[in-house]
């Protein structure tokens, strides 16, 4: 295994570095933390009936574990590898998580050292039948990562071109097929493939000028619902907030009405969430009026002929009488800073 190994979190394909980081980022954010649950998306066609799941170390006498790189020492080894009651390796994304955990310290240790560490860990924690297969997958994974370096973008490649990005993702899928069978691909790369495709479809929706903002919200909500349940929940929580901000800006830029905003929110989040957001809007409007009145009165104090000490005392009294809670007082002071900076810049 010659050549420099590129950590999966920082794959470099020349000019497409930023593209892959964009596409792979979501996978790492929403990657299931423990992988100890029965994951339908990764194990439903792999796990035999009546299989008893066991952690890699549950019923195995551990051998000598590798010495971790300095940055990993003190952390829990992220290797949620599972074996069945017969000591056979169960294919889950936890295998890949294990490999990536060790390779995240590339630079502190060489590729060869990290491969040796992973082998040592697998041999120490897995029964022989499982460790042999896991080591085979490790060798294939390293070879796969090396092969990714040979991918070349097409001439005129642009990172905001959805079709060009789709070709990159399709190329990656073809490379995976060179090193893994269908079950292995589903286990190791199933989440990533689903999330990459989700991201591309999301870009297509935003780029579609024939869709209204409400229609975009509806399509995005459908897109999230089409993800496997294990992924959809995490994506929904994080992505809906970002989409809400972007679609709100679109409506405001077009001079949309309050009803336009309401319709978009209902399509994206549902009526109950839309009700809550309207309440937040009303509370924010009241707050904005209150703080604007306070800042205006504060400006009058600052423009007065009183000495600095008297001004500060008057402002403190005004602030305390205008805002009734500690949180509002702190927030008001933050607005003061922004207001003063804006005044100096004008």
From Swiss-Prot:
It is a single-pass membrane protein. The keyword Cell cycle does not apply. One of its GO terms (molecular function) is unfolded protein binding. The keyword Transmembrane helix applies. It comes from Acinetobacter venetianus (strain ATCC 31012 / DSM 23050 / BCRC 14357 / CCUG 45561 / CIP 110063 / KCTC 2702 / LMG 19082 / RAG-1). The chain crosses the membrane at residues 10-30. It is found in: Cell inner membrane. Belongs to the lipase chaperone family. Pfam families: Lipase_chap. SUPFAM superfamilies: Lipase chaperone-like. This is Lipase chaperone.
């Amino acid at each position: 295994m010659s050549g420099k190994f590129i950590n999966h979190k920082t794959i470099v394909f020349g000019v497409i570095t930023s593209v892959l980081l964009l596409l792979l980022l979501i996978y790492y954010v929403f990657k299931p933390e423990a992988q100890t649950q029965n994951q339908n998306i990764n194990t439903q066609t792999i796990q035999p009936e009546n299989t008893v799941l066991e952690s890699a170390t549950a019923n195995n006498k551990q051998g000598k574990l590798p010495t971790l790189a300095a940055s990993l020492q003190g952390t829990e080894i992220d290797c949620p590898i599972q074996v069945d009651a017969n000591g056979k390796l169960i294919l889950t994304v936890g295998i890949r998580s294990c490999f990536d955990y060790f390779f995240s310290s590339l630079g502190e240790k060489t590729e060869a050292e990290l491969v040796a560490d992973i082998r040592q860990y697998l041999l120490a924690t897995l029964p022989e039948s499982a460790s042999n297969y896991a080591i085979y997958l490790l060798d294939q994974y390293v070879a796969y990562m090396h092969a990714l370096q040979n991918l070349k973008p097409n001439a005129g490649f642009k990172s905001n071109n959805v079709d060009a990005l789709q070709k990159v993702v399709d190329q990656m899928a073809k490379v995976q097929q060179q090193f893994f069978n269908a079950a292995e691909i589903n286990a190791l790369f199933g989440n990533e493939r689903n999330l990459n495709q989700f991201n591309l479809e999301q870009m297509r929706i935003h780029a579609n000028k024939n869709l209204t903002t409400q229609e975009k919200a509806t399509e995005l909500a459908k897109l999230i619902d089409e993800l496997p349940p294990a992924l959809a929940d995490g994506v929904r929580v994080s992505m809906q907030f970002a989409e809400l901000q972007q679609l709100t800006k679109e409506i405001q830029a077009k001079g949309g009405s309050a009803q336009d905003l309401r319709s978009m929110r209902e399509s994206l989040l549902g009526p109950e969430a839309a009700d809550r957001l309207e309440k937040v809007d009303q509370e924010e409007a009241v707050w904005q009026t209150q703080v604007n009145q306070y800042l205006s009165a504060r400006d009058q104090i600052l423009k007065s002929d009183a000495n600095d000490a008297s001004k500060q005392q008057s402002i403190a009294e005004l602030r305390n009488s205008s805002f009734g809670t500690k949180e509002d007082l702190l927030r008001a002071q933050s607005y003061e800073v922004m207001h003063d900076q804006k005044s100096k810049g004008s």
